[in-house]
Curated annotation (Swiss-Prot):
It is found in: Mitochondrion matrix. Homodimer. Pathway: Cofactor biosynthesis; biotin biosynthesis; biotin from 7,8-diaminononanoate: step 1/2; Cofactor biosynthesis; biotin biosynthesis; 7,8-diaminononanoate from 8-amino-7-oxononanoate (SAM route): step 1/1. Its cofactor is Mg(2+); pyridoxal 5'-phosphate. (8S)-8-amino-7-oxononanoate binds at W323, W324, Y421, K611, G645, R756. The lineage of its organism: Eukaryota, Fungi, Dikarya, Ascomycota, Pezizomycotina. Signal peptide: none annotated. It comes from Emericella nidulans (strain FGSC A4 / ATCC 38163 / CBS 112.46 / NRRL 194 / M139). It holds the Pfam family AAA_26. InterPro entries: Aminotrans_3, Aminotrans_3_PPA_site, DTB_synth_BioD, P-loop_NTPase, PyrdxlP-dep_Trfase, PyrdxlP-dep_Trfase_major, PyrdxlP-dep_Trfase_small. Recovery of biotin-prototrophic clones from transformation of biotin-auxotrophic mutants suggests that bioDA could be usedas a new and convenient genetic marker for transformation. This is Bifunctional dethiobiotin synthetase/adenosylmethionine-8-amino-7-oxononanoate aminotransferase. One of its GO terms (biological process) is biotin biosynthetic process. The keyword tRNA processing does not apply.
Length: 787
């Protein structure tokens, strides 16, 4: 089922009515608000929607509106007879899925907008966290719609606490509470206390007289008197100046919300300097306002001309995973609670010389998760680039200490791969070869040697390892494989002819660089498997394995001029050069495994994790290192310490969110949450599941690999990469993928796809919680665009 956009129209003011508890008067409030709208000629027609109702039909809330607000359109989507919570009442019926409920609500509101309705209320059942039919909290069930809230507070004893708790639960989930109403009670005076509380939040609170009490007798005369009393009550409250003023306020807020979204792009163009963006020729129309985000989707503002009756927000699949950060979905309430808990417990506290529980627990959990016996220490930084700066400092210090080099007198280089990218801070920029990213950076120097390498792709339905033409004399020709699992059978391939060729080429190259050119190298730095920003370059895992093996197995290459080679102290000591893995992008389940190093059978001496570390919520980075690397900075001298840090180092909010994110992802791995995806990639006569798999279907890859415009495709974990043919050459400056990006952005009537391109490569990336149904829908759009 296609996702729904959040609910926003120019002409229709739609609000959701939540209660601080059950039996606080939600339907009473809905009735007099609709009656007041009907009475005021400038408010348009009113409508009332009850998505889920429980209890006898003659007591249903929509029936109450039909009786006491006869000029209001009413509708109930799902009625269950038993007067209990919806998740219990629905058990004896065919339970509608949450997405079906959302679609029905959105479709009903859209129909009403087209019919000229000006005011609509969507009333929930029970309290804020009362379960829906599938057992999920209503606050989460309806969150994709993000309707502005009218909160009915509780005027009874204990109502102050329940009302504030209800408000905070809504706020935590990203709802906007536009107004609060409750019944006056001169004894408990909750309206006085809550009025002051919500005034401090700039939220109007309207106290109204309590409705007449229901008669205890249920004879016809008593019921008739009750109905008459209610009619008089509604007639009185409807005319209240406070109620009329509230309706005017709701009109204004809807108008202001639409106007703000209207202006956001043009205002941003005037004030925002965007990263990785050439602003020359950039217009306001090129900027997409995002009103909110939930799960895999942005809610983007439609800037194209639309009538007042058409919805203004559209669901947009976050195809770049918001620069590769998304793991557990946007607006994740669990992570929001984690952040709020840590913010409430700590705020931010100084880290050096101190320790707090989230930082310690995360460090221990991360070391256990990556399961690399070399790694024993965790250094915290703010983002991937700074984490790699720290890794570089660690590696170079260890190498210089072992080999007796003075980096102030001679240049110490790194070994890496062409197309690598490790961040935008100046040190790690020098760890990449000259490119579009750095050629206009004034302090860039480029200190290293970067190996070209064979690429993995599927073309014409066949997995291939494609060797650059300039290397075929040394590495041999292209190879074909029966499956992606076969490509990753590194332990077998390392003994093959290709493995021997790779090692010989790497060894001879390093010998030439050191002996003939006199270069010194202090670290081997690699992005395991996929070089992301360089163009989603899928490196042959065998080549990376051989590179690490040659560096570690030939320490004599790097100690030229030293009489004796300091031998590693243990089997876990680094040898040759410290091996640094930049897993900022590829680590922590992005490629379907806890660590992308496991694909290579290589345990790095230093590893950096960032993007998925916090599930996609806040910045945080860890640089993991061995004790031997750590000891290179240990001495009586302060100057020998790792003098690097940030004001918000190991901030408690990020550490707590990361701890809970890591726990969630580990649980998903253990409980088989991805088994359906794995089974899709299982080969005939293979084991239970594929060793290498993707959330993107194998059939999609096979289909796209035959497309006329496609040079090659691959998918692994949550990453899908499509390389398009370009007669003028591939690379970051290519525009070949722009056309496909434009077609995806156009999407369909219900949703579209946001994506990023890297030259001739368009990639899509899901979260680790993406549903198979959602991704197969996206795949359908891709097929339409390319086949």
């Amino acid at each position: 089922m296609a996702p729904v956009g959040a609910a926003l129209w120019r002409s229709l003011r739609a609000h959701q009515v939540y209660g601080a508890n059950t039996d606080v008067g939600k339907t009473i409030v809905s009735t007099f608000l609709c009656n007041a709208v009907n009475r005021l000629k400038n408010q348009g027609k009113s409508a009332f929607l009850k998505p889920v109702s429980t209890g006898p039909l003659d007591e249903a809330d929509d029936r109450h509106l039909q009786r006491h607000a006869p000029n209001t359109l009413t509708k109930c989507l799902y009625q269950f007879d038993e007067p209990v919570s919806p998740h219990i009442a629905a058990k004896t019926f065919a339970i509608p899925r949450d997405d079906e409920i959302l679609s029905s609500v959105h479709r009903t509101l859209s129909d009403w907008a087209n019919d000229g309705v000006g005011f609509a209320l969507v009333e929930t059942a029970g309290g804020v966290h009362s379960p829906g039919p599938n057992g999920n909290s209503q606050a989460d069930l309806y969150r994709p719609l993000r309707l502005p809230i009218i909160l009915v507070a509780d005027s009874r004893l204990g109502g102050i606490s329940s009302s504030i708790s209800a408000y905070e639960s809504l706020l935590l989930r990203g709802y906007d509470v536009h107004s609060v109403l409750l019944f006056k009670d001169d004894y408990y005076q909750n309206h006085e206390y809550l009025g002051n509380y919500f005034r401090g939040k700039s939220i109007p609170l309207v106290p109204v007289p309590a409705p007449p009490r229901r008669p205890q007798e249920q004879d016809p005369d008593s019921r008739a008197r009750d109905l008459e009393a209610l009619d008089k009550y509604y007639s009185s409250v409807t005319k209240s100046t406070d109620v009329v003023s509230l309706l005017d306020e709701l009109v204004l807020k809807n108008k202001q919300r639409v106007e703000y979204l209207d202006e956001m792009a043009s205002r941003a163009q005037k004030t925002i300097w965007y990263p990785f963006t050439q602003h020359h020729g950039m217009a306001a129309k090129d900027i997409t306002p995002i009103d909110s985000a939930y799960d895999d989707f942005f809610q983007t503002y439609v800037t194209a001309d639309r009538s007042a009756q058409q919805g203004r927000l559209q669901a947009t699949f976050d195809g770049s995973a918001s620069w590769w950060t998304q793991g557990l979905g946007h607006g994740n309430p669990g992570l929001a609670l984690s952040a709020a808990y840590a913010a409430g417990r700590y705020g931010h506290v100084m880290f050096p010389g101190n320790i707090h529980e989230p930082a310690l627990a995360l460090a221990e959990s991360l070391l256990k998760t990556v399961d690399n016996p070399r790694l024993q220490k965790v250094f915290y930084t703010d983002n991937g680039s700074t984490g790699m700066e720290v890794a570089l400092k660690m590696g170079l210090r260890a190498a210089c200490d072992r080999y007796g080099w003075d980096a102030s007198k001679e240049q110490i280089n790194i070994l890496g791969l062409k197309g690598s990218y490790h961040g935008d801070t100046i040190g790690v920029m020098d760890c990449s070869e000259p490119s579009t990213y750095n050629q206009r950076v004034e302090w860039y120097r480029g200190r290293g040697h970067w190996f070209d390498f064979p690429l993995v792709k599927m073309s014409q339905g066949v997995w291939q390892v494609e060797v650059p033409a300039t290397l075929q004399a040394s590495l041999g020709g292209n190879q074909q494989f029966s499956s992606l699992d076969a490509v990753f059978d590194v332990e077998s391939r390392v003994r093959s002819d290709a493995g021997q060729r790779y090692r010989k080429y790497i060894l001879e190259t390093i010998e030439r660089l050191v002996t003939q050119e006199g270069k010194k190298f202090g670290a081997l730095i690699m992005e395991p498997i996929i070089l992301g920003a360089g163009g989603m370059l899928f490196c042959d895992p065998l080549f990376q394995r051989c590179l690490a093996d040659v560096v570690r197995g030939n320490p004599q290459l790097f100690n030229r001029g030293r009489l004796t080679e300091p031998q590693p102290q243990t089997d876990l000591s680094w040898s040759g050069l410290p091996v640094i893995f930049d897993e900022v992008f590829t680590g922590l389940y992005r490629l379907g495994r806890k660590s992308s190093a496991s694909f290579l059978g290589v345990n790095p001496d230093i590893a950096v994790n960032a993007k998925l570390l916090t599930g996609g919520l806040v910045p945080l980075c860890t640089t993991l290192a061995s004790n031997e690397i750590f000891n290179a900075f240990t001495s009586p001298e302060k100057r020998d310490a790792l003098l690097h840090g940030h004001s918000y180092t190991a901030h408690a909010v990020g550490c707590q969110v990361a701890l809970d994110s890591l726990r969630t992802m580990n649980n998903m791995d253990e409980d088989g949450s991805w088994n359906d995806f794995k089974n899709d990639w299982k080969q005939p006569h293979a084991g239970d599941t594929a060793r290498v798999w993707s959330v993107w279907s194998h059939k999609l890859l096979h289909n796209l690999s035959h497309a006329e415009s496609v040079d090659g495709v691959f998918a692994i974990g949550s990453v899908l990469s499509i390389s398009l043919k370009d007669a003028e050459g591939a690379g970051y400056t290519s525009t070949a993928a722009k056309g496909l990006q434009t077609r995806l952005a156009a999407g369909g009537p219900q949703f579209n796809v946001h994506s990023r391109v890297l030259g001739n490569v368009l990639y899509l990336m899901s979260s680790v919680t993406s549903k198979q149904e959602t991704l197969r829908t996206i795949e359908g759009i891709l097929r339409e665009a390319l086949l």
